Amino acid sequence: MQERHTEQDYRALLIADTPIIDVRAPIEFEQGAMPAAINLPLMNNDERAAVGICYKQQGSDAALALGHKLVAGEIRQQRMDAWRAACLQNPHGILCCARGGQRSHIVQRWLHDAGIDYPLVEGGYKALRQTAIQATIELSQKPIVLIGGCTGCGKTLLVQQQPNGVDLEGLARHRGSAFGRTLQPQLSQASFENLLAAEMLKTDARQNLRLWVLEDESRMIGSNHLPECLRERMTQATIAVVEDPFEIRLERLNEEYFLRMHHDFTHAYGDEQGWQEYCEYLHHGLSAIKRRLGLQRYNELAARLDAALTTQLTTGSTDGHLAWLVPLLEEYYDPMYRYQLEKKAEKVVFRGEWAEVAEWVKAQ
């Protein structure tokens, strides 16, 4: 059974999105996993904890014996069935545990006894994690062009359309503002970093690129933060600023935050609960910046939001949202972004409307 254990092998796994059958306990998987991994644990959280205590108190032989006792009979058969099905569904996949130790070797041996030869990651998740960290450090050294602009300028779409673009907000499952959450929960920090590394590796392998095109992000995107190596390089990067007309920005924001989010919530939860979730999402976003708006202004905008939601519910029209969105942009988001941009004005190398910036970026 051929094992993979070189740095290039690990990178190749990430670039190819090789399916990984991760046999660590769910708690370990939730703390950090590779993008193409599925969690089919040898031991659940309680079993792993019991074996860990036994190991500390009685040593490795006793812990191993306890593990075999806990994962036996019907439990073992159920897990074998799941591993067998996953192997057949992913014939070019690979097994992985924490460090390429006993857990992945035990599962590999059991599968072999059942007639399935399946490789494993020699260094386990730890080796893949170190590969992801190192790849991000190395690839971050390439030049970066940042796409800046006020809310609603279509920065994310512009980045997505570049062959050398990496959509940081898409990877983080958050659009980076008080209203930025999506219906997908954010990943753990380690899983986000692993996903980012894999995306950078794949993009670089496709393009052999000279520079990255990224959105001008702050350090935090929701609950995830950018790796320090990348964030440091972004602070040194040149910036192209999208300056679209206010009306165009409003159209984009209406589509993204009202029409699309309402559709997504109702698609996920059904009409009634979806509407409630959508309303709560908008109110939560406004509430998140209550302190910065001031109580009086917040109450005024919240009342306008309620009125807009009533209109949307009864007529289907989202036009009423302009009554609170326009002042929110004019009084809060636009001044905040312009202030931030002023502090790095010397890094701005191009300004223009969306199509002009897109054309300029392609020429770089």
From Swiss-Prot:
<dbReference type="InterPro" id="IPR017582">
    <property type="entry name" value="SelU"/>
</dbReference>
<comment type="similarity">
    <text>Belongs to the SelU family.</text>
</comment>
<comment type="subunit">
    <text>Monomer.</text>
</comment>
<dbReference type="GO" id="GO:0002098">
    <property type="term" value="P:tRNA wobble uridine modification"/>
</dbReference>
<dbReference type="GO" id="GO:0016765">
    <property type="term" value="F:transferase activity, transferring alkyl or aryl (other than methyl) groups"/>
</dbReference>
<dbReference type="GO" id="GO:0043828">
    <property type="term" value="F:tRNA 2-selenouridine synthase activity"/>
</dbReference>
<feature type="domain" description="Rhodanese">
    <location>
        <begin position="14"/>
        <end position="137"/>
    </location>
</feature>
<keyword id="KW-0711">Selenium</keyword>
<comment type="function">
    <text>Involved in the post-transcriptional modification of the uridine at the wobble position (U34) of tRNA(Lys), tRNA(Glu) and tRNA(Gln). Catalyzes the conversion of 2-thiouridine (S2U-RNA) to 2-selenouridine (Se2U-RNA). Acts in a two-step process involving geranylation of 2-thiouridine (S2U) to S-geranyl-2-thiouridine (geS2U) and subsequent selenation of the latter derivative to 2-selenouridine (Se2U) in the tRNA chain.</text>
</comment>
<dbReference type="InterPro" id="IPR036873">
    <property type="entry name" value="Rhodanese-like_dom_sf"/>
</dbReference>
<keyword id="KW-0808">Transferase</keyword>
<protein>
    <recommendedName>
        <fullName>tRNA 2-selenouridine synthase</fullName>
        <ecNumber>2.9.1.3</ecNumber>
    </recommendedName>
</protein>
<feature type="active site" description="S-selanylcysteine intermediate">
    <location>
        <position position="97"/>
    </location>
</feature>
<dbReference type="InterPro" id="IPR001763">
    <property type="entry name" value="Rhodanese-like_dom"/>
</dbReference>
